[in-house]
From Swiss-Prot:
Belongs to the class I-like SAM-binding methyltransferase superfamily. rRNA adenine N(6)-methyltransferase family. RsmA subfamily. One of its GO terms (cellular component) is cytosol. It comes from Burkholderia cenocepacia (strain HI2424). This is Ribosomal RNA small subunit methyltransferase A. Keywords: Cytoplasm, Methyltransferase, RNA-binding, rRNA processing, S-adenosyl-L-methionine, Transferase. S-adenosyl-L-methionine binds at N19, L21, G46, E71, D94, N117. Transmembrane segments: none annotated. GO terms for molecular function: 16S rRNA (adenine(1518)-N(6)/adenine(1519)-N(6))-dimethyltransferase activity; RNA binding. The gene is rsmA. The lineage of its organism: Bacteria, Pseudomonadati, Pseudomonadota, Betaproteobacteria, Burkholderiales. It is found in: Cytoplasm. Specifically dimethylates two adjacent adenosines (A1518 and A1519) in the loop of a conserved hairpin near the 3'-end of 16S rRNA in the 30S particle. May play a critical role in biogenesis of 30S subunits. It catalyses: adenosine(1518)/adenosine(1519) in 16S rRNA + 4 S-adenosyl-L-methionine = N(6)-dimethyladenosine(1518)/N(6)-dimethyladenosine(1519) in 16S rRNA + 4 S-adenosyl-L-homocysteine + 4 H(+). Its EC number is 2.1.1.182. Pfam families: RrnaAD.
Amino acid sequence: MSNSRQHQGHFARKRFGQNFLVDHGVIDSIVATIGPARGQRMVEIGPGLGALTGPLIERLATPESPLHAVELDRDLIGRLQQRFGALLELHAGDALAFDFRSLAAPGDKPSLRIVGNLPYNISSPLLFHLMTFADAVIDQHFMLQNEVVERMVAEPGTKAFSRLSVMLQYRYVMEKMLDVPPESFQPPPKVDSAIVRMIPYEPHELPDVDPVLLGEIVTAAFSQRRKMLRNTLGDYRETIDFDALGFDLARRAEDVSVAEYVGVAQALAALRKAG
């Protein structure tokens, strides 16, 4: 496989994190994993040169119910419009600032399916941005750096367990679906990739916790991950009775379950409300 940054006459741009999927066997496996069906509301993030876009359109799009796509590279937008016409509705702009809720069906029922080969240089901030629309989403299937996927699905007590693990596991059921080697791309990235499936918890399954407060606690806990929690959460010891919660501060951040972090955030919320 050539290391050239040019594919189909387009030069992959490093600032956009572009690596184009070219392995048709991998593409078929990804599409089968997604399982698109006619008439579904689906949005693709970063369609690139359309490697996934084409097979997705074949299976679900009609002129009345097109596939939606968010693309930042204006050179690619013109090519995609010319190739797919009315079967693809393109939204020019940065996915980090895009209002995905604007594409959801009216009402409270989740209706969106989101897919994409996400730019690896913005994957974590984009995943956090997408959390704000989780109540409108049926599922998400993303190609990501394998290391990121391993952190997303990591268990407590492992080195991969991180702030990203806690915040995403609080909101989604997640599963690593496929490994994708570098040679599946043009140009090949310097890392292995993987497909992850993310299914938001339904409202009745979600713990009653302010995600902002949860994020505050988790960020503090993982700020110095080699230190004990009695140090990283030291600022909260005068406010929260950790002993009453049964929360052992003689641990490191990666040894604490998602449910325990939620419990601390709930306690903090109650104290701030009372005070």
